[in-house]
Amino acid sequence: MQVTPHVRAVQVPEDEPMRPGSTNIYLVGSGQTLTIDSGEAIDKFRWMLRGYLAAVERSEIGVAAVTHHHYDHSGNLKDLRAALGAEVAVPDNGVGLLRGRLPADGVQTLHDGATIDLDDVRVQVLATPGHSVDSLCYYIEEDGVLFTGDTLLGVGTTTVGNLGDYRRSLQRLVELPNLQVLCPGHGPLVHDARERLQTYIDHRNMREDQILRVLRRGGPRTSWEIMLQLYPDIDKRLRAAADGNVRAHLEQLRGEGRIRVTPGRKRKPRADVVARRKAKERERRAVIRRARRFEAAQRRELWRRQEEPPTDTWTRQPTYAIDE
């Protein structure tokens, strides 16, 4: 999908509620190519990106950058380095969070105010913490295109870690010059860029007012109880995410001295429960490894069938000759 003369979007369909509509990878530049985000380390992301590169007659990537460390944005970095020769660019405060996903070489770090200079376009790097501690946005001022990762989504609202940081990041973005189009990490493009950012700011203010009203009206509540009142009809699969956003608001209100907190008591897991969880995690990883080996074997078999005569279909193949 062509966004501007400098930007193309590869939108990989998703059916998970936390990734509304699609997970997006962006190609920037008409000469040297920059990718923004990589998708997960599974075949649908690899093949859609490679198919798109082939369609636009590209065989290499110059730089593979990410907006933050979450797996659906950074899972394919090793593959982009190994298969397409990309230099990998990650947030300077996200290297530790990306442990296990970075290639052995060809890694550079990005900080607020840095630029990525391609043959025909300059991309600004903006630190926008809030969704995650290492969140970055990328901005092409001449096109008015802002790549937001999960700081802003194409549909709905995002999850928030530190609400104070997040509000400051939104305010910074809404004040960018020439802002026109938002390219989010998930979902469709947003063409009313400044209005959507202001909607996000207003939404967080509204949620804060709602939380305070719940506490004034009903007395002490847990974050989960507040969440159920604020989001009575939410998809149950999104309840934990909504509870996280409520807790982010409560933490900011506590820090400002506007509410008091009565400490809870965490449940201490029993040794047998911990052991079962570890065993299940080992089993889960083993299943994933077996599935990946199976997929690799299937691919090898598919290619072998292209290279050899179809002896598994024919005991003797038809032959053809001139009828004289």
Each predicted region: which residue ranges?
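Metallo-beta-lactamase
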Residues: 33-35, 40-43, 122-214
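Histidine-centered divalent metal-coordination motifs
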Residues: 67-73, 131, 186, 249
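C-terminal regulatory/interaction regions
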Residues: 214-324
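A structural signal for the main folded, soluble domain(s) of proteins
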Residues: 1, 61-64, 75, 80-91, ...
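Short, well-ordered beta-strand micro-motif
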Residues: 9-11, 27-29, 117, 124, ...
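Active-site HxH/HxHxD metal-binding segment of metal-dependent hydrolases
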Residues: 21, 40-122
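Conserved beta-strand hairpin/beta-sheet module of binuclear metal-dependent hydrolase folds
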Residues: 1-56, 136-154
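Residue-level signal for inorganic ion chemistry
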Residues: 6, 49, 186, 211, ...
